[in-house]
Amino acid sequence: MLKRLVDLFEGDPDQFITTSLTGEVDERGKHEANYLTIHEPLTPAKWQEHLDGKVRIGVRPENNDKCKWGCIDVDPTTYKNYSQKKYVSIIQEYKLPLVPVKSKSGGLHLFLFLKDWASVEDVRKKLDEWNDTFFMANEVFPMSKAVTMPYYNCNATVEFAFDDNSNPLMIGAFLDLAESKRLSVKELYNLKTNAYEPETEWQNYPPCVQKLITDPWPGNNRNNFLFNILVLENKKTDGNLDIKALQEIAIERNK
């Protein structure tokens, strides 16, 4: 099991990070952490300490200009009513070769695993394409930063993968799933996905409005966001919506 995990997350050969939760939660409900860079190779022994719950580690995907895995980091605007289910459903519906894993902060890491080393630029291009289409997350790896590894304290972990039905997976089942979704470089380059249309005229919405619809409203900007939505809805009817209709749309969008 350890060898399979080390092989799956092979990355920067010269350094790794350790992370520790502070016990504090920010205004969004995200668990905060401290990070320390260790300038030495990540050994199987250190991986074992991670699995045993002694040291939480993170790995940078890049090995020079190549990588064997990448990650879309879903960090929701608010964690209060957050659920991974819609992201898991998107992965299943559009047959994306991604493995969803709960992150230490309570969000979601969507991992892509490759059979061979691939160009960092090419992997980022594909992940950015999927992110822009389906997820609109703020961070996509590789990006010269480390990703905290899953299955810390693996026998009692809270950082686990999900299957297609959003059920948590033990580490052995995660490894089976991740290895089954591994792509060759050629398969990655040739992979096509269907257009994402969660509602009518989705492709005509500007990216900022798409983001606001798919993610809960940040409280400080809610009114501005609702205003942008209503402007768009009014344009769709050539300005024929009355005040009552706009109010009803605002109430529905604000749920």
What residue ranges belong to the model's regions?
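Catalytic "initiation/cleavage/transfer" segments centered on a nucleophilic residue
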Residues: 5, 134-196
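Short beta-strand
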Residues: 59-62, 98-105, 138-142
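Glycine-rich, often proline-containing surface loops adjacent to acidic residues and nearby aromatics
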Residues: 63-73, 103-113, 146, 226-227
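Short amphipathic beta-strand starts and helix->beta connectors
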Residues: 51-58, 91-98, 215
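DNA replication initiation on ssDNA origins
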Residues: 1-69, 77-87, 145-147, 151-154
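Modules that initiate DNA replication and primer synthesis
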Residues: 77, 107-108, 112-126, 153, ...
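Helical (often loop-to-helix) elements that flank the catalytic cores of nucleotide-handling enzymes
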Residues: 80-93, 113-138, 155-173
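Catalytic residues for metal-mediated phosphoryl-transfer on nucleic acids/nucleotides
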Residues: 72, 88-90, 94-97, 194-196
